[in-house]
């Protein structure tokens, strides 16, 4: 009798970026009474919940540094490693930079799973690094109760081209590079409800590199950029709004989703992270239907880029995306800060 294939998702209590600590709890963790250390060369720190730290080298070039890791969101070890690495590298692209090196982070239950599984995970990470044009240059591993994988990634960028999530401008249009619904489809798969025709859709989306961010950064009219991951579209949009002292409108009828998403929502395939996200920032969002909440708060793993673009530069950015085979689509717009507590209105 053939051995049953190992299903990595059975060995973890969370999945992908849905493992993230909720924004509300994270705020408590990061709060400190200690005096802040000031470094004038640190261009981007943790004050605005940006995707990575940026350090000015003083010669027109800045270093970008980031880390990201999580537990399995798919069963295949190679795919898990590839997705985790792609997701980590994305933070460099979200700042507009170019990655130059990756360092692996591996936690593995050595008494539960064979070492060959870990080897495949690391190989998946190495494959993604090669796709991004960088070496997997080293790493660190520990024996842990659940499989964990990710990267610490270093990148570079021209200092003047850094795209912060706190530099958006009122009037900018908001665009996305990937459809939403990754958390919903992976939950449907975990529940055994995913239809054959939808197999692999989420994996393909998660493995798509956000390398287009390096090209977007060359357009001055791109005022802010972030990747949409565990806090969902609304969570990461709120970070842009609060960092930039703005409000936003989301056009729900323009949101693109992966095939089958709305059917799976109706079947109850909504990840736990969706509710945690809404509990954290729902009071900052206008009235939502249950379907809108499930889509807009859906935790994305290795999700697309959310880009704020000045209206006169929209066509330029669309053309750049089209040349790269990316279907950029509009999701909303930024406006002056509202006097109410509502940061994002959904229409």
Swiss-Prot record:
UniProt GO molecular function: ATP binding; magnesium ion binding; selenide, water dikinase activity
Q: What are its GO cellular component terms?
A: cytoplasm
Disulphides = none
- Please name the top-level EC class of this enzyme: transferase
Indicate which residues the UniProt annotation says bind Mg(2+).
51, 91, 227
Q: List required co-factors.
A: Mg(2+)
Record-linked CDD domains: SelD
List of residues binding ATP: 20, 48-50, 68, 91, 139-141
Which reaction is the catalytic activity of this chain? hydrogenselenide + ATP + H2O = selenophosphate + AMP + phosphate + 2 H(+)
**Superkingdom assignment:** Bacteria
GO BP terms in the entry? selenocysteine biosynthetic process
Site features described as Important for catalytic activity, chain residue numbers: 20
Keyword vocabulary terms for this entry = ATP-binding, Kinase, Magnesium, Metal-binding, Nucleotide-binding, Selenium, Selenocysteine, Transferase
**EC numbers:** 2.7.9.3
Q: Which InterPro entries match?
A: PurM-like_C_dom, PurM-like_C_sf, PurM-like_N, PurM-like_N_sf, SelD_I, SPS/SelD
Q: Where is the active site?
A: 17
The record's remark on the cofactor is: Binds 1 Mg(2+) ion per monomer.
Physiological role: Synthesizes selenophosphate from selenide and ATP.
Q: Belongs to which family?
A: Belongs to the selenophosphate synthase 1 family. Class I subfamily.
NCBIfam families hit by this protein: PRK00943.1 (NF002098), selD (TIGR00476)
Q: Describe its assembly.
A: Homodimer.
What's the protein here called? Selenide, water dikinase
What is the taxonomic lineage of the source species?
Answer: Bacteria, Pseudomonadati, Pseudomonadota, Gammaproteobacteria, Pasteurellales
